[in-house]
Amino acid sequence: MAHARSVSGVTLLDQGVYQGVWSAGLRASTNWSTLIDRFDVILSRTAPDLVVLVEADMKTIMNRLRSREDGDTRFAPDSQAFDRGIRGYESLKNRIRSTDTAPASIVIENETREDLSSGVDRIAESIHSIHN
């Protein structure tokens, strides 16, 4: 979520600066800590007001990737790219959650439709608390 500074209201971004760092790092050979350090200035200047971390257990993620009919994915389960992607997510999550200057963040589960429904409620509550 990014608050549009010049416009009243809220802007929701499905992908933001943290997603961009993860995507760049997915194909890089640099370790995640070094990569995130390199992007630190950009992250601190362009960070949204709220980062929503969406999680599911590993089995669910792997099953969802395998069930994609068109095979459209940047990495297959049980691949080096998959493992790197997971490590990158965890590295970014740890950075977001452990840095005083990082934006607010919440973790929502994405195992079931009910999880998504309660996650939407939590996101709305978080947005409301940030902007009131």
Predicted regions and their residues:
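Conserved acidic residues
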Residues: G9, D49, S105
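Short catalytic/ligand-binding loop motif for oxyanion handling, primarily in non-cytosolic enzymes
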Residues: Q19-W22, T60-N63, D115-S117
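Conserved phosphate-donor/acceptor-positioning beta-strand/loop module used by diverse small-molecule
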Residues: Q15-G16, S44-S67
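Short, structured coil/loop segments at alpha-helix boundaries
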Residues: A28-W32, I36-F39, R45, L53, ...
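Short, functional N-terminal and low-complexity linear motifs
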Residues: A28-W32, E55, K59-T60, R87-S91
